[in-house]
């Protein structure tokens, strides 16, 4: 999207604030339905981020897959569950909860220190984007695949790890 600089910066700050507030709403709201709506708001703000960075295909995929399918599925699952079990014994923490939060905090801090200590400019990627000669003859989906496997390999893998953790959390919540 070609916007003047100050408007673009304002929209980035506005959407970033929306993502942070929505994420806090997901974590801090005690009603699971409100948390699911807050998660949908975060997904919509992320989609608008993609639109601001001229990634219309990724924005459409974000809206269709995450907001349209996954968030609606989460809402249906939460609405069909028994709501009374969320509020009894809410304030009690067991030893397992404390140990789990300690392990998660240690893993998060080690991941952050690894990211900050890594020299990202020294990493050799498998294919550089300047090695692809015939860009005019490649379709948009092929260009997207090439970009995901070269320039955006690290964010793509980090997103897969985040989705894996979310899946494991959903399985753990469903087992209880």
Swiss-Prot record:
Signal peptide from the UniProt entry: none
For this UniProt record, the keywords arranged alphabetically read as follows:
Chloroplast, Membrane, NAD, NADP, Plastid, Plastoquinone, Quinone, Thylakoid, Translocase, Transmembrane, Transmembrane helix, Transport
Give its localization: Plastid, Chloroplast thylakoid membrane
Pfam families, alphabetized: Oxidored_q3 (PF00499)
Topology with regard to the membrane?
A: Multi-pass membrane protein
**Recorded E.C. number(s)?**
7.1.1.-
Q: Reaction(s) catalyzed by this protein?
A: a plastoquinone + NADH + (n+1) H(+)(in) = a plastoquinol + NAD(+) + n H(+)(out); a plastoquinone + NADPH + (n+1) H(+)(in) = a plastoquinol + NADP(+) + n H(+)(out)
Q: Does the keyword Plastid apply?
A: yes
Report the domain of life of the source organism: Eukaryota
User: GO CC terms for this protein?
Assistant: chloroplast thylakoid membrane
Family matches, as InterPro entries: NAD(P)H-Q_Oxidoreduct_6, NADH_UbQ/plastoQ_OxRdtase_su6, Nuo/plastoQ_OxRdtase_6_NuoJ
> TM segments?
10-30, 32-52, 61-81, 92-112, 152-172
One MF term in the entry's GO annotations: quinone binding
* Its job: NDH shuttles electrons from NAD(P)H:plastoquinone, via FMN and iron-sulfur (Fe-S) centers, to quinones in the photosynthetic chain and possibly in a chloroplast respiratory chain. The immediate electron acceptor for the enzyme in this species is believed to be plastoquinone. Couples the redox reaction to proton translocation, and thus conserves the redox energy in a proton gradient.
Q: What do we know about how this protein assembles, alone or with others?
A: NDH is composed of at least 16 different subunits, 5 of which are encoded in the nucleus.
Q: Which family does it belong to?
A: Belongs to the complex I subunit 6 family.
Q: What is this protein called?
A: NAD(P)H-quinone oxidoreductase subunit 6, chloroplastic
């Amino acid at each position: 999207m070609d916007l003047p600089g100050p408007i673009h910066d304002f929209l980035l700050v506005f959407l970033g604030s929306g993502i942070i507030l929505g994420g806090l709403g997901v974590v801090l709201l005690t009603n699971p339905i409100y948390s699911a709506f807050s998660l949908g708001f975060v997904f919509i703000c992320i989609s608008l981020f993609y639109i601001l960075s001229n990634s219309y295909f990724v924005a459409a995929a974000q809206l269709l897959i995450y907001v349209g399918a996954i968030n609606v599925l989460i809402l249906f699952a939460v609405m069909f569950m028994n709501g009374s079990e969320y509020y009894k014994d809410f304030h009690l923490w067991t030893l397992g909860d404390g140990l789990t939060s300690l392990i998660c905090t240690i893993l998060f801090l080690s991941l952050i220190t690894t990211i900050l200590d890594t020299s990202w400019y020294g990493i050799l990627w498998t294919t550089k984007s300047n090695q692809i000669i015939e860009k005019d003859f490649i379709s948009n989906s092929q260009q997207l695949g090439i970009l995901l496997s070269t320039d955006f390999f690290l964010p793509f893998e980090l997103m897969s790890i985040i989705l894996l953790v979310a899946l494991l959390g959903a399985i753990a919540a469903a087992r209880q």
